[in-house]
Amino acid sequence: MVESGPHSINDDLSTNEYIEQPKFYHDDHASDSNSLSDIDDDNKKHGGLYGTVSRTTTRELPEDLESEISSTHSQDAKEDLEIQHNAAPYSLLNYRDKWCMVALLTACGFWSSLGSPIYYPALKQLEKQFDIDENMVNITVVVYLLFQGLAPTCSGGLADKFGRRPVLLIGMLIYVVASIGLACAPSYGVIVFLRCVQSIGISPSIAISSGVVGDFTVKSERGTFVGATSGFVLLGQAFGSLIGAALAAAWDWRAIFWFLTIGCGASFAICFALLPETKRSIVGNLSIRPKNPLNIAPVTLLPAARRKLKYDNPDYETLDKTKPVFDLTSAFKICALPEIFLSLLPPGLAFAMWTLMLSAISSELSAAPYNYKLTIIGVCYLPAGIGGLIGSFATGKIIDFQYKKKLKVFEEKKAAGIIPEDEKFNIMGARLQSVLPQNFLCVVTYILFGWSCDKGWKIPSILITSCVSSFCAMSTLSAMSTLLVDLYPGKSSTASSCFNFMRCSLSAILMGCFAKMKHSLTVGGTFTLLAGLVFVGNFLMFIPMKHGMRWREEREQRAALKAKSMDQANENGYKLFSKIKFSSPFKSEEKV
């Protein structure tokens, strides 16, 4: 809620939540602030890294210098410059600490992505034990994916309002309890119900993890850390079937859920002790101790941690002054914006096909002409896991490189007068451009995978196409998560849940229809049809790349005009009201 004049209005969800911040300049580089490359050179000279604490200085920007810096840098460039050279650093976490946070977030979210594919190799065992057909057993997969898309849209708002830590930990606890119930489930109906509960508990962790990374990174490094976090978290989806096949072959399907119980329980204990609260409206740059005990990690009570986080000298200026408003429909409103919807639909469909591919590996390799055992099928998932791992590491670096390159060209053109001074940097174009090559490449690999399974081609064709497809899927996820955090830094968990909702909803639809489509079109025909939809959909992404930022600016202007007119109307109403003279309704009775 933003206070404006005599009344309050809600921010339009299509715009970022802006708050008035102190203006800064850095005294060591004021003379050469026209070049971003000079800042990069200084970074290298000092051995510094974005987000480190050691080399930053800050002073208030005098009014006579404000216009000079404003005219030489875009908003994105100024943001990174101010953050990098600010005496109150954007985050007290150094480079090593940030990677430790990535490891903790992976421990949280890994079990969400693992919960679905670890189950695939055991589907045949469930069919036999409960005497159900393929369509019914697929329902247990579909409901998990469905709630994996829906639950984060609500939990993301809770995390943006009450903090990341309590929502993550409560979700993990629900997941552990549901996994115990699944391991002991006596009937098919109980399995379906507890799969819903299991998904509701753990699925928000993926979106919230992106929000946590957005809390302690700036745009110039965000791609690396969001990409790594998203990629590591979703490695469970790539390696899950390998683990599930080993467990089901050694024991039975119940061993899978005991494994999830033990693994997530251990991760819960680690995260409970070590994971700090990062929501900037609660802890700022981590120098402010949370008031709510649920937001306090035990490790931060140690003297060494207190000194590192500077609890004795908190910097309240780093607090996000925007008051988050919990809205259950917030994620859906963001997702419905044209530039967001057009950006998310093609990658979401491509990612849903990846989920379908992982399921198809198990079902197709267990049938003729392959007739592989569970252990061999599990090994066949290894290339998909390796491809996803490479995609996670490589894409983050590519995204950051693309961002810096585009921003540098933009700054040079602005300095040369080629583009207007008031034009904003097109961050949507920079981020989406890094997605398109992978999205077009996966069209080819999905078609080849489908026909490899359909015609019984040699197994290397299936392994290679699954590896490349996994690389593309992880690349797409990293780029889209980074873009959403960039566009909505104040509610990054809610924004990240939009892509989660899109990809999981489409995955649930495809999984629900796969058996019938395979029967009607064959595996090759099904993957060819869906890959064609991805190919056509990819061209939709060119629309937000070109017009997305303009649409957002137009909505900002309309929102500003609406706020101004409401202010004026309220002011006129107040003046009119003050001129009205009221007589008392109570009159003394006349004496008779």
Curated annotation (Swiss-Prot):
Keywords: Cell membrane, Glycoprotein, Membrane, Transmembrane, Transmembrane helix, Transport. The keyword Membrane applies. The keyword Membrane applies. It is a multi-pass membrane protein. Residues 1-77 are annotated as: Disordered. GO terms for biological process: amino acid export across plasma membrane; cellular response to acetate; xenobiotic detoxification by transmembrane export across the plasma membrane. Disulfide bonds: none annotated. It comes from the Eukaryota. The chain crosses the membrane at residues 99-119, 139-159, 166-186, 188-208, 231-251, 255-275, 340-360, 374-394, 432-452, 459-479, 497-517, 523-543. Disruption phenotype: Leads to intracellular accumulation of flucytosine and clotrimazole. GO terms for molecular function: monocarboxylic acid transmembrane transporter activity; threonine efflux transmembrane transporter activity; xenobiotic transmembrane transporter activity. InterPro entries: MFS (IPR011701), MFS_dom (IPR020846), MFS_trans_sf (IPR036259), Sugar_transporter_CS (IPR005829). Pfam families: MFS_1. Belongs to the major facilitator superfamily. CAR1 family. Multidrug transporter acts as a determinant of resistance to acetic acid, flucytosine and clotrimazole, these 3 compounds acting synergistically against the pathogen. Reduces the intracellular accumulation of the antifungal agents flucytosine and, to a moderate extent, of clotrimazole. Its role in acetic acid resistance may be indirect, presumably through the transport of a still unidentified physiological substrate. This is Multidrug transporter AQR1. The gene is AQR1.
